[in-house]
């Protein structure tokens, strides 16, 4: 509202993680706005931040207004609501190349934080249906995990949106008309909404993340 723009609802998919890797998501108990401001001023906000140990394949949903941070040792794919706004409330006193502390947005952030919705959560994955696991379905995007071990027709007609296919394990060849594209681990391709189908050929057991907008 401050800038006349959207909030930033997000989803995190952990691609890889070191043994001691963790994220920060929400608070570890209810924190009032007044307590938040006091802790920020005295430098002990970290005491009430909720830390989650992470491992490869974990999925987290971050609603707009929730305090969050990706910490060291994490390689994460982020899907988010379209927004150009990020409020930084704490930066571990890190400095840029010129020795300056990065800008913080403490006053703006305290207006944006939803202090009533303070508990983050890891998503409990449901059993696969025909090789597809729905990870997140919200008003801003849908993300599915596709497990592919043999060639298959990929029907795009029911999806009234562009589609992002992200290879998170293995690699595949995408074929359509007389053309093809190879997608390897760590790569993403955008499929235009006008395309109705293509053929997916995995070379090894493969996991793809399918992301689109629910229209």
Residue ranges and their predicted role:
Residues 1-56, 71-171, 175-176, 181, ...:
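Active-site region of the double-stranded beta-helix
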Residues 186, 199, 208-214:
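Sequence termini and other peripheral, non-core segments
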């Amino acid at each position: 509202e401050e800038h006349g723009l959207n909030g930033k609802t997000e989803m995190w998919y952990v691609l890889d993680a070191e043994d001691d890797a963790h994220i920060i998501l929400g608070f570890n108990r209810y924190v009032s706005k007044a307590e938040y401001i006091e802790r920020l001023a005295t430098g002990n906000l970290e005491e009430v931040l909720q830390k989650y140990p992470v491992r490869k394949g974990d999925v987290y949903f971050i609603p707009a207004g929730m305090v969050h941070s990706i910490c060291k040792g994490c390689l994460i794919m982020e899907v988010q609501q379209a927004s150009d706004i990020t409020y930084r409330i704490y930066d571990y006193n890190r400095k840029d190349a010129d020795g300056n502390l990065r800008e913080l947005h403490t006053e703006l952030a305290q207006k944006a934080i939803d202090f009533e919705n303070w508990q983050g959560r890891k998503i409990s994955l449901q059993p696969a249906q025909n090789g597809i696991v729905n990870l997140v379905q919200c008003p801003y995007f849908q993300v599915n995990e596709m497990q592919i071990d043999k060639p298959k027709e990929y029907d795009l007609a029911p999806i009234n949106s562009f589609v992002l296919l992200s290879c998170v394990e293995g690699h595949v060849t995408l074929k359509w008309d007389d053309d093809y594209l190879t997608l390897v681990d760590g790569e993403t391709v955008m499929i235009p909404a006008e395309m109705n189908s293509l053929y997916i050929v995995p070379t090894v057991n493969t996991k793809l993340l399918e992301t689109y907008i629910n229209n």
